[in-house]
Regions:
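ATP/NTP-dependent adenylation/nucleotidyl-transfer catalytic domains that generate, transfer
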Residues: 1-42, 52, 56-59, 64-70, ...
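Conserved G/P- and acidic residue-centered "switch" motifs that form tight phosphate/ATP-binding loops
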Residues: 47
C-alpha cells in the first residue's frame, strides 16, 4: 500500500485507491467469508477513524448492512455527536444512539463515595461501556463489531485495553494516523471531520496531540523508523529531537503488553496462541 519512492520522499505516502480496494476486500473476506456475517456495526465518535471505517464498511457490505452507533456521555462534545450524525446521513445508514451516562455514573457511584473518579479511570469505564453497547447491539442485529483504531494509537498504547481493541476485525490497524487522514480524504469523509483536532472525547477539551505533547506528523515518522529497527540516535539524525524520540520510544516499549492477548503460563505443547495455531494465524 506504500506509494512509490517513499524512501526518497514521504515514508508514509500511500496509494490511496489501492488501500481503499484492499480494505474493502479485507472487510468482505473477514466478515462474510470467514465469519458468516452480512452486517457490521461501527461505533461512531465523529472522528476521522470511525468515519473512515464506516465509509469502508458501506462499500464492502452495502449501506443497508451497516449500523452506526453513537454513544455520548454527559461531557461529550456536541460537535462530536453532530459530526457522527453527518456521517450517518451522508452514508444513509441505520443508526442507534445510546447515552452511556447512566451506566457509567451508576457504576462509579457504587465504587466511589462521591461518585467521582480520576479522569483516566472514568475514561476507561466510558470506553469499556461503549464496547458493552456495541457487542450487545451486535447480538441484537447479528452484525459484527468493526474496530476503528489506527496503527499510531496501537503502537503508543493510546487506547483502553479490552475496549477500543476488542472488535474482532480492524481495517485501520496497519495505517498510521496520517495515512488514515489521507485515505479518509480520498473516500470522501466530510472536510469538517478531517480538519478538526483528533480527540478521544473522554475529558472536555482533551486532544490526542495534547496528551502526546507531540504532533502526529512527527509521531508517525518516529514510529515508522523505530519499528523498522532504527536506533534512537539514528532517528534523531533524521531531524527529530532526542526528547521527541525518547518519548515515542518509551511509549512503544512500555505499552507492548497492550498489543498482546493475555499472557498464558505454558504447561503443555498445545498452549492456545503459542503452539495451538490454525494456518490463518501464521
Amino acid at each position: 500500500m506504500v506509494g512509490p519512492g517513499v524512501e526518497e520522499g514521504d515514508p508514509l505516502q500511500i496509494d490511496a485507491d489501492l488501500a481503499r480496494r484492499w480494505l474493502v476486500s479485507f472487510l468482505k473476506d473477514e466478515l462474510v467469508r470467514r465469519r458468516g456475517f452480512t452486517k457490521g456495526v461501527v461505533g461512531l465518535s465523529g472522528g476521522v477513524d470511525s468515519s473512515l471505517t464506516a465509509f469502508l464498511a458501506v462499500e464492502a457490505l452495502g449501506k443497508e448492512n451497516v449500523i452506526g452507533v453513537r454513544m455520548p456521555y454527559r461531557t461529550s462534545s456536541p460537535e462530536s455527536l453532530g459530526d457522527a450524525l453527518l456521517v450517518i446521513q451522508t452514508l444513509g445508514i441505520q443508526s442507534v444512539t445510546v447515552d452511556i451516562t447512566a451506566a457509567v455514573d451508576g457504576y462509579l457511584s457504587q465504587v466511589e463515595r462521591d461518585g467521582d473518579a480520576d479522569p483516566t479511570r472514568r475514561g476507561n469505564v466510558m470506553a469499556r461501556q461503549r464496547m458493552i453497547v456495541l457487542f450487545d447491539l451486535s447480538a441484537k442485529y447479528q452484525a459484527l463489531p468493526i474496530g476503528t483504531s489506527n496503527k499510531s494509537e496501537r503502537l503508543l498504547g493510546y487506547f483502553t485495553w479490552h475496549a477500543d481493541d476488542t472488535p474482532p476485525v480492524n481495517p485501520l490497524g496497519d495505517l498510521f494516523k496520517t495515512q488514515v487522514r489521507a485515505l479518509a480524504r480520498h473516500v470522501g469523509v466530510p472536510e469538517v471531520i478531517l480538519r478538526k483536532p483528533p480527540t478521544p472525547d473522554l475529558v472536555p477539551g482533551q486532544t490526542t496531540e495534547g496528551d502526546f505533547g507531540i504532533s502526529y506528523d512527527k509521531v508517525d515518522r518516529i514510529l515508522y523508523y523505530l519499528i523498522r529497527g532504527m536506533k534512537p540516535a539514528e532517528v534523531v539524525a533524521r531531524g527529530f529531537t532526542p526528547e521527541e524520540v525518547a518519548k515515542v520510544a518509551g511509549r512503544l516499549e512500555s505499552t507492548h503488553w497492550k498489543r498482546r492477548l493475555p499472557t498464558v503460563a505454558m504447561m503443555s505443547q498445545t498452549a492456545i496462541g503459542e503452539f495451538y495455531l490454525r494456518p490463518v494465524d501464521y
